[in-house]
Amino acid sequence: MAIFKGEGVAIVTPMYEDGKVNYDKLEELLEFQIANSTDAIIICGTTGESSTMTHGEHLKTIKFAIDKVNKRVPVIAGTGSNCTETAIMMSKEAASYGADALLVVTPYYNKATQKGLIAHYTAIANAVPETPIIMYNVPSRTGCNIQPATVATLVKNVKNIVGLKAASGDLSQIAKTVSLAGADLELYSGNDDQVLPILSLGGLGVISVLSNVAPKETHDMVMKFMEGDTAGAAKIQIDAIPLINALFCEVNPIPVKTALNLMGMNVGPLRMPLCEMEESNKETLKKALQDFGIKLA
């Protein structure tokens, strides 16, 4: 059984002005997502600024989300690290809290070989044998690209490595991955502008930044495709492209947090080294939000 089908939000982590995590606001965001048909919550991923959290904050935020969601939708916890030992520790803790699955990014900076990636993911999976793992491939951010044969080896040989969040942007590579891994692989788009192409390759949904500001529309796009209304799904995908482009005109999550603040959601600042959005880009973002029909505060 798939971890989820449809639209999973890579949710932001709201902050107070002093940079501390705003758990009251996080609860509001979780309720907003669930009320608007979100199919899964992905907590402490790239969009959640996990890379600037302490381990204590990271784990507290994961536990908070799991407890507040309370099984209404799956909660997938980001527990990846470029240190295998740290990833194992984070994964074991998240599993003990009741995470429905783990999202584990490829190791970054230290440039593991494909052999090293197999060892890394196998060690993590063996430490949490009852918890499903989704691998996360985003080479533009990590400098590490997990190859199709490596994905296939892992999903075929490690029982709880089940999925891939594909954010390479390379549809040929993704198609080859599907070809090699076959039915063993649960595939999710990691790029909001490639949802329908990846669904057409057998994908089950999207782990989405766009969903922070447009959860219902993103959910509807995936559902329409799965129900056979490809024209309806394509219209949503095409209509969303200007907004998606605006949400990535600076590095994620700068634009999406800015967008939520423009919408009156008051998610607070970013943590350094991320910084406030350029004013010219903010104006582009405002227009894209309004053109998509999103009301600003």
Predicted regions and their residues:
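C-terminal alpha-helical cap/extension of soluble enzyme domains
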Residues: 8-14, 36-38, 200, 207-297
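Gly/Ser/Thr-rich beta-alpha loop segments that engage phosphate groups in nucleotides
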Residues: 8, 47-50, 80-82, 165, ...
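Catalytic cores of TIM-barrel enzymes
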Residues: 2-3, 36, 176-179, 260
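Short, amphipathic alpha-helical "lid/cap" segments that border enzyme active or binding sites
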Residues: 23, 27-30, 148, 282, ...
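Glycine-rich phosphate-binding "P-loop"
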Residues: 137-138, 160-161, 271-272
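A general structural signal for well-ordered alpha-helical segments in protein cores
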Residues: 26, 58, 62, 87, ...
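Active-site beta->alpha loop and helix N-cap motifs at the rims of alpha/beta catalytic domains
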Residues: 2-9, 13-145, 153
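Catalytic alpha/beta core domains of metabolic enzymes, predominantly
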Residues: 127-128, 141-248
